[in-house]
Amino acid sequence: EEVVGKQKVNWKALYEKSLNHDYTERFIGDIKTPVKYATPQLRKMIGEVEEKMTQKFIKEEIPKEFQAIYTKRLSEAKDDTLEGKILSICDKLDLLYEAYGEIELGNPNPVFMQMFKESLETIKKYDDMVCVQYFIKHILPDLFKGDFAGKDKMQRIAFSILLMGDADK
């Protein structure tokens, strides 16, 4: 364990959660983000399929005496523990950077601006955490230093979310 801010991080738990949280992609493949984010209904359906396939895998492939352990390890790792919250933030940072990269390269697909917005909204929900405060204060501003198509819109979205709590204003 390590103290970060005023909280103790259990690095072993965080490592296990990080290692296993995308395990379900083994069953359905890594569906490209724009496809996953095409509609909320599709995202929900993909999650349901992943969950059912994971349960089936555990039931059919894992010896009975280890099924409870694997059910826990392969379940949703983004829980209310400190480590689950850190994983949620990291996952959204990954998505935010994916969207940023596509926008910076000039990809006109509006799904990337939506991904950027939704990622930042989720990250903002954890703004009581030291790592998020650091990201907002020191890292996020660097994203807007260069010139690229979509920069002004991204800045407006970030400003609205971080200062007003609503990107639609």
How does the language model describe each region?
Residues 1-169:
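Alpha-helical, largely C-terminal catalytic domains
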